[in-house]
């Protein structure tokens, strides 16, 4: 056996060596001397027209350890391009001091794109909006005299040009532009200027012309674009941003290609917003409407939104960004959005020759029905897009002598102008739903300690003025928090005689939230919203005879990210009075105010191990405002994404091992009765196996014992498919632009596949007929077939995948039922079979965990295994891992040199 296993190890070592870094595919998309140009039809790479399916992934919104997987997954989704903004305030936090480390390592991110054989679009801006703090503009710009942002204003143009040229040179030095052999094929100057151009009038046109000329003068060798415009200066290409650019946007310059720089895959959300979704069907419909009319580049904004870590989100914007994108906040594929768009990309690319070079024609087939055709008669190639633009009205049209059924608000692709190979409303791919699981590792030692911030008094503050100061000028974007404090004297006849009558403090604020204290007693909280420019804090409070101290902690949920008046946006107390006194209203606005920017915990970095040691901690208590809480937790096993559930808390900040996870605000309840976001992503890259420091700053009231560390899975998969769907993409292929069937059975089928290490445990729902709803919320219709669930159980239970025919006879359905849509809806619950492996390795043979992982994977027959699922410990020469206690062991012992492998498995799997 030893010889047999030794041979397996040797083979595994060879295979592992081939998998080590450096074995990436050679870059072939561009080379030194590549020419990127354009004509009226498309961008051209070395004179060849091409199609570009792009996805927005912003490098600062995910840790570098996630970038490669995100880009690889995007490529699996049929994309060939990744788009990103460049974040000025992240790269130049102080004038002339640049930062390109960690999540802001732009060059590393572009190299990841290059290593995965994809193009890049870089939107330099440098104003970007992006729901990013201050629209990406550094705060210090506001302190430059006479500056007006994004205008024909010399101070702004000087700083803008300096940064643009700095970024361009940095990209050139790294050989990132296509003519240098790099991935960048397109760059953007400015951003959605049409939104504020009306405020700039003639000066706005001058500014745009200057920006275009300045950008072109940098000589990057690839085209520049200006987005959300119908026309752009000179050779700059205007592009569209929006949901339905095929129907809402007109390109005025007919010598330039139709490019779509932002196809919004959902609606970004702010605290207080309810869930906002955009269906896969609507996105696909919009894309094909745009391509039917000649579009050749679409960029999904966002394809992966990621996380607004720390304080990077704009005013009120959720910490989780575009979670409804094709890849969710954690990088997991959101089905059916991911798969339905992947199929669309593959279909169009299969017929790119007819599409890019064919003669275009247009036909009206009826009210709301259109055909857009692309034909190359000499090559016998024909491609047609049949559109039904009517809402709620399915229909059948006659096109070139044949009848075609086209659902409402959908587009069908006819690959040879007669065979339907894709319809935007007919979804084949499975659906999926997320679930959250509290792990044993994180539930242990759930012991919290706390430290409460001191409430400042007027006489101890250093910045004192007659009236309250503007907030941003004090915090300078280094903190969300500014203390305002004032003191005043009351006599006994000032106070109400009745004890049931309490004075009321009224404060008008243009900040985002406020916490009030009177004589150190908590008074209450107040807040605004994204839609309100100000709010009124109005709370009763207890006052006393003598000196009374008022302290208000004003907070900002990010700086505004757009608008022509961005430099003029203010925050803080605008008016303050006390009502309900016997002597009338007391106006405190001119009473004299003290200010303290930032929290003590921020100043001393309480969220780090070093900073934490400067404070006296005590056992945690519930429902204390302005309090820091801390505990330690171990990293959950496996590689599932990790979140922290903050449902038991109210509002504040989260830190893990010194990293700012972001703002939370679970006390801001939507109209639906729940928080906009209650779980917050903790990237595994921020963690170590044991003893992770979790720090919470709670502004209001909360119960830290209820905070949960959880893992995220997509445990429910679904299919929702009709007999009317066209043949699945897997049943045909393109042969020189001609359609070719590759399967004998082209009937409609629903295919359900489990993720790795999962099997089908339960059929939660199954119905054939006219079911309604969505994955996780299906309901049976009036034509429901009672036998459907038993049939699906027989076909699927215990398996890693199953194929379900979508044929009424299989389920005993009554095809004559008046309301039937011949639709199958199935929801399956998956079982998790996670194999936990622990290895004790003697020295000399194995130097890297990655090789150990590959060896074990090959020995055990699980090549998909990754190092996150393994625990590796190097044994000492005299001490063979004494703390290693596997539950079930399989030993392997070799010599020359010695190596010992001890493998521990759980009960789900055996070697």
Curated annotation (Swiss-Prot):
Entry-linked InterPro entries: BetaGal_gal-bd, Galactose-bd-like_sf, GHD, Gly_Hdrlase_35_cat, Glyco_hydro_35_CS, Glycoside_Hdrlase_35, Glycoside_hydrolase_SF, Lectin_gal-bd_dom
Catalytic residues as annotated in Swiss-Prot or TrEMBL: 192, 262
| Intracellular or extracellular location(s) | Secreted, Extracellular space, Apoplast
Chain ranges of the SUEL-type lectin domain: 744-831
Could you give one GO CC term from the UniProt record? vacuole
Reaction(s) catalyzed by this protein? Hydrolysis of terminal non-reducing beta-D-galactose residues in beta-D-galactosides
The record lists glycosylation at 263, 389, 473, 777
Q: Where is the signal peptide?
A: 1-25
Arranged from A to Z, the UniProt key words for this protein are:
Apoplast, Glycoprotein, Glycosidase, Hydrolase, Secreted, Signal
Report what the protein is called.
Beta-galactosidase 12
